[in-house]
C-alpha cells in the first residue's frame, strides 16, 4: 500500500511539473486545420 501511494504521488508530481513546463500543442487549432483540409478536398476544383 505504501509503495502504491509513493508511486502515485510521484507520478502526480511529475505529471504536474510536465504539464506546467511542457508547451502543449493546441488541439483546437489542429482540429480546425483538419476540418478546413477535409472541406477543401470535398469541394471539386472550380476551374
UniProtKB/Swiss-Prot annotation:
UniProt keyword Chaperone present: no
Gene induction: Down-regulated by TLR ligands, including bacterial lipopolysaccharide (LPS), in bone marrow-derived macrophages.
Annotated Pfam families: DUF4535
Phenotypic effect of disruption: Mice were born at expected Mendelian ratios and do not show any visible phenotype, displaying normal heart function and cardiac dimensions. Cells however display defects in complex III activity and metabolic perturbations in the heart, as well as altered complex III assembly into respiratory supercomplexes.
Keyword terms, alphabetized: Immunity, Innate immunity, Membrane, Mitochondrion, Mitochondrion inner membrane, Mitochondrion outer membrane, Transmembrane, Transmembrane helix
Keyword Transcription among UniProt keywords: no
Alphabetized InterPro entries for the sequence: STMP1 (IPR027854)
Cellular compartment(s): Mitochondrion inner membrane; Mitochondrion outer membrane; Mitochondrion intermembrane space
Domain of life from the UniProt record: Eukaryota
Listed transmembrane segments: 7-23
Major subcellular site: mitochondrion
A single cellular component GO annotation: mitochondrial intermembrane space
One biological process term in Gene Ontology: innate immune response
Mode of membrane association: Single-pass membrane protein
Tissue: Widely expressed, with highest levels in lung, skeletal muscle and heart. Expressed in bone marrow-derived macrophages (at protein level).
Entries under PANTHER family matching the protein: SHORT TRANSMEMBRANE MITOCHONDRIAL PROTEIN 1
Function according to Swiss-Prot or TrEMBL: Microprotein involved in mitochondrial respiratory chain complex III (ubiquinol-cytochrome c oxidoreductase) and complex IV (mitochondrial cytochrome c oxidase complex) assembly. Required for the formation of mitochondrial supercomplexes (SCs). Also required for the activation of the NLRP3 inflammasome.
Oligomer status and interactors: Interacts with components of the ubiquinol-cytochrome c oxidoreductase (cytochrome b-c1 complex, complex III, CIII), such as UQCRC1/QCR1, UQCRC2/QCR2 and UQCR10/QCR9. Interacts with components of the cytochrome c oxidase (mitochondrial respiratory chain complex IV) complex, such as MT-CO2.
Stated family: Belongs to the STMP1 family.
Name listed for the protein in its UniProt record: Short transmembrane mitochondrial protein 1
Amino acid at each position: 500500500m505504501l509503495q502504491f501511494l509513493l508511486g502515485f504521488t510521484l507520478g502526480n508530481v511529475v505529471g504536474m511539473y510536465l504539464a506546467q513546463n511542457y508547451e502543449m500543442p493546441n488541439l483546437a487549432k489542429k482540429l480546425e486545420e483538419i476540418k478546413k483540409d477535409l472541406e477543401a478536398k470535398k469541394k471539386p476544383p472550380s476551374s
